[in-house]
């Protein structure tokens, strides 16, 4: 087995297979779940809008894939909803069966210097999740732009109780980058807390993913590359990785 094949298998196991499109419907969510080829590899989670959590759960159960987590998003994508709405969204999503909540911080408030607002959104969302759901915190690194703000947002997410810190919504001009990833991982490492990392948006090929795996190993060590601490948020990546794995089986 080549190194590329091993990496491809690892990438699938770390993936949040994602569909967050405005025209999503039950059929598209079923198609998303049906794109999983159990023989080639099973992702860690699927990520869908809250109203499709139940559809995703049923589709996974029909494929005997109930162990795959279902994630959803809150305060998405602009980070501008009032806190009470965000908490309501969170509780409804958990009632629908969401295992993981990907919260967008009010990053525009952070750019204005309102760190306390960000901390409140994270800590209150964490309380709403309780022990029922993991909290992944999206800092929208491509909009924060500066290393100082990216590090600060990561610190606030950790302080608020995030289980993972995630780069991006995938809905802005600049999404996951290796530069932002390096800052975020070093900030997580410095905290000495067991916080995971998720790269989302722009990771489209096995080659793209491999660059993130290499950087993460250098900073956090091999053991960090497990679904409990590392994820890729992606849609088209699965097809590319399956292609690599399919060719390896020929």
Where are these regions (language model features)?
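Short donor-sugar binding/catalytic loops of nucleotide-sugar-dependent glycosyltransferases
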Residues: 203
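Alpha/beta enzyme core
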Residues: 2-41, 51-197, 206-235, 243-250
